């Protein structure tokens, strides 16, 4: 779970090309949602990660500090425990949006817009900032970035499998 989440974080800065923490958060989470639309096995892994108590606890304890750094300016007086608790709410939203497939009535753009709005509202991001961030995220080529992340994930898994079996690495 840790590797799955940390590997995409490095790609986010390259995709966005900016250092606005709210935009980076929105892009990172939008990439997760996009990945689940492109790969059913990864959708199952993400949904499981946001369902099982052991992986949920890992997610919450490892993201609360990061969430505090991003959103504390919008929530004066909050403490780390507040962001841990709010991550429980945003994690539930994330799981729900990951589990629901896009369809004729619910495009990826609609899904990302609604998802990001829900999460940023939890963290008291002002509406004007939400609109700005969502517009920028929807303008990104998340499809290509998600495909690259999926391919890199598959390559790492294959390399790990080959190493575990004592097979030479593919060239």
Predicted regions located by residue number:
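Phosphate/oxyanion-binding loops and surfaces in catalytic or ligand/nucleic-acid-binding neighborhoods
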Residues: 35, 39, 93, 100, ...
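HTH DNA-binding helix-turn interface
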Residues: 1-3
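Short, hydrophobic secondary-structure boundary micro-motifs
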Residues: 43-48, 128-132
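Short, surface-exposed acidic
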Residues: 19, 76-83, 128-131
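Short, flexible helix-adjacent loops and helix caps
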Residues: 9, 13-17, 41-44, 71-76, ...
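C-terminal peripheral helix-coil segments that are non-catalytic and often amphipathic
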Residues: 69, 73, 103-171
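Amphipathic alpha-helical packing segments from all-alpha helical-bundle domains
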Residues: 27, 49-102, 106-118
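Hydrophobic alpha-helical connector segments
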Residues: 9-42, 52, 60-64
